[in-house]
Design a protein with these regions (language model features):
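N-terminal membrane-targeting/anchoring modules of bacterial envelope and secretion proteins
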Residues: 1-249, 258-259, 272-291, 295-298, ...
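Short beta-strand/loop motifs in extracellular/secreted proteins, especially
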Residues: 264-268, 309
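Asparagine-centered strand-capping/turn motif at beta-strand->loop junctions
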Residues: 257-265
Length: 370
């Protein structure tokens, strides 16, 4: 009887204690739709109001919890607030009002979360199912980068618990914008195989905001096209300069400039593709370019026939994968190859002989008729 009583008491104790622990844990999410554009400026100043003590993101920091508290935070939001705190610009050039508000919000966040559990969402808070279908490897990047950024801003280690379980919502990104996302993602992935720069990794992670459920139709279109512009500018920092050249002999060397505007050295190769058979040229093997510098290559060409042609110059990595868009080298061949000359003279001579023969026949035929 005593054993039964003890068992009943134990069950009653478990019933009241375990749910209480769950009930006393407050989960606070700090997420927001993106405000910062891919060039670093801000679309508007709406985030300032959200960060105020009375705002959507400020209130949770002022509320005293009744028990334990778990914070679920998007590192992309902290990056935006940090950019505001350091001094920021609006895209429309209007005065900003949120620098001090952002500074105070970050300081308050570090203080109130210091003893609490913090879980980092995948960077940019993307739709998890859509990210898995689009690029599983990028979702892993979003998760690790999101963790890195939250730890950086809070200046401490946080829970290694996956934020995938905390992500909710469905993105309504249409097929056209999904295709643009994929193209930009692939372009930055290829660039990162050559350029090991923080800004390339950051921009690659920032593409996750395009998959965010927090964006409405207008926002999705705006940020998708803004991302394409930003990625194009980043790709242009490593480029082959287009140009016009003339070859006046059977062989000649063309000076082609390759520029690296990143703060890190890179190793690249260049694939050269003539669009017709007037010239022949070989690809350029891998070579190094220093940080923020340019290299001029002297590329040998062999001319086959006179006339104009275009050669596509494409930067590649060591595996031969294309990096960035191709540049156009306009080549004008002005010399006559001896083989072409012999062929032309021979053809003219044959035409002359044929015409002379035809004339003789006509004269003879005329005499016979008389």
């Amino acid at each position: 009887m005593r054993k039964i009583s003890s068992l009943v008491l134990a069950l009653i104790f478990s019933f009241f204690t375990l749910p209480q622990a769950v009930a006393d844990t407050t989960v606070t999410k700090l997420i927001a739709k993106p405000h910062q554009l891919f060039d670093g400026t801000f679309r508007n100043d709406e985030l300032t109001n959200d960060l105020l003590p009375t705002g959507r993101l400020g209130k949770p920091l002022e509320t005293k919890p009744k028990g334990l508290r778990t914070w679920v935070i998007d590192g992309a939001l902290l990056d935006e607030v940090s950019a505001m705190a350091a001094g920021y610009q609006l895209n429309n050039k209007k005065p900003t009002t949120g620098q001090q508000v952002a500074q105070e919000w970050l300081s308050r966040l570090k203080l109130v979360t210091s003893g609490d559990k913090v879980v980092a969402l995948p960077y940019g808070n993307p739709d998890i199912d859509l990210a898995k279908r689009s690029a599983p490897s990028e979702l892993r990047l979003y998760s690790t980068y999101g963790l890195e950024r939250v730890e950086f801003h809070l200046n401490r280690k946080i829970s290694a618990e996956s934020g995938l379980n905390w992500s909710t919502g469905t993105s309504k990104l249409n097929p056209l914008l999904r295709k643009k996302y994929t193209q930009n993602r692939q372009a930055l992935t290829a660039l990162s195989s050559i350029v090991n720069a923080p800004e390339v990794k950051a921009q690659r992670a920032k593409l996750a905001v395009l998959l965010s459920p927090s964006l409405d139709k207008k926002d999705r279109e705006f940020f998708s096209y803004n991302a394409a512009e930003g990625v194009a500018q980043t790709l242009n920092r490593l480029r082959v300069s287009s140009g016009k050249y003339q070859i006046a002999s059977e062989t000649g060397k063309v000076p082609v400039t390759v520029t690296n505007d990143f703060d890190v050295p890179v190793k690249v190769a260049v694939k050269l593709t003539p669009l017709n058979s007037r010239v022949q040229v070989s690809n350029v093997a891998e070579f190094a370019i220093g940080a923020n510098s340019r290299t001029q290559l002297s590329i040998p060409f062999t001319a086959i026939a006179p006339g104009a042609t275009t050669v596509l110059a494409q930067i590649t990595n060591k595996d031969g994968e294309f990096v960035g868009p191709a540049s156009k080298l306009s080549i004008n061949v002005t010399f006559f190859d001896s083989r072409v000359t012999y062929f032309t003279v021979g053809a003219a001579l044959l035409l002359f002989i044929a015409a002379f023969t035809q004339t003789i026949r006509r004269i003879r035929r005329g005499r016979h008729e008389k």
